[in-house]
């Protein structure tokens, strides 16, 4: 990010401004955009607001049963969903108050392990509207806390998501400009859903 020459340090990164992008382009179909490098935007740029309101499509998949959970979030990942929780725990980001409550339930449990039990429970709703669970474990409690399932009575739950087979194209970027140009056109918040394995 910086270089040293003749005892002086120089920035080796670009600071993006509004002039670098066409912000009048229409929204695109929801896609999963992947870019894992830092980038810099000029203070006060309209681009910052554009990024903040843009949407990130998130999928949590597991190896056990092929079921995946899909969520949408704002670019800053402030939405209270499972994908953001696991992301914040992995990256050691300060947890929001709600996420701290979730942490008290499941802690820093392995994502694959958690998904195995969560999706196995959710799979029961394919055939039943109401699923009995006399003694909810930490994974069922986490699903309930997020509102993905709701109490039907003291010993059973109802499904509060939807099953959907919608596919989202995944694009991987190695250039910050191209990523930002695509990200600011991601405007659709897709309702949280469960996708069944093939």
Where are these regions (language model features)?
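Non-catalytic recognition/regulatory regions in large multidomain proteins
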Residues: 2-198
């Amino acid at each position: 990010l910086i270089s040293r020459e003749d005892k002086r340090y120089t920035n080796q990164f670009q600071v993006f401004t509004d002039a670098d992008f066409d912000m009048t382009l229409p929204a695109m179909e929801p896609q999963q955009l992947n870019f894992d490098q830092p980038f810099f935007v000029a203070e006060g740029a309209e681009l910052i607001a554009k990024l903040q309101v843009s949407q990130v499509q998130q999928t949590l998949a597991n190896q056990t049963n092929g079921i995946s959970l899909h969520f949408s979030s704002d670019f800053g990942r402030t939405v209270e969903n499972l994908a953001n929780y696991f992301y914040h725990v992995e990256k050691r980001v300060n947890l929001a108050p709600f996420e701290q409550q979730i942490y008290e339930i499941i802690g820093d449990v392995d994502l694959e392990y958690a998904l195995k039990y969560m999706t196995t429970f959710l799979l029961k709703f394919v055939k039943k509207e109401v699923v009995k669970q006399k003694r909810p474990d930490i994974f069922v409690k986490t699903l309930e806390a997020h509102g993905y399932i709701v109490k039907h009575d003291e010993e059973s739950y109802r499904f509060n998501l939807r099953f959907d087979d919608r596919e989202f194209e995944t694009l991987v970027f190695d250039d910050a400009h191209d990523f930002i140009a695509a990200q600011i056109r991601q405007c659709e918040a897709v309702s949280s859903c469960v996708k069944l394995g093939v």
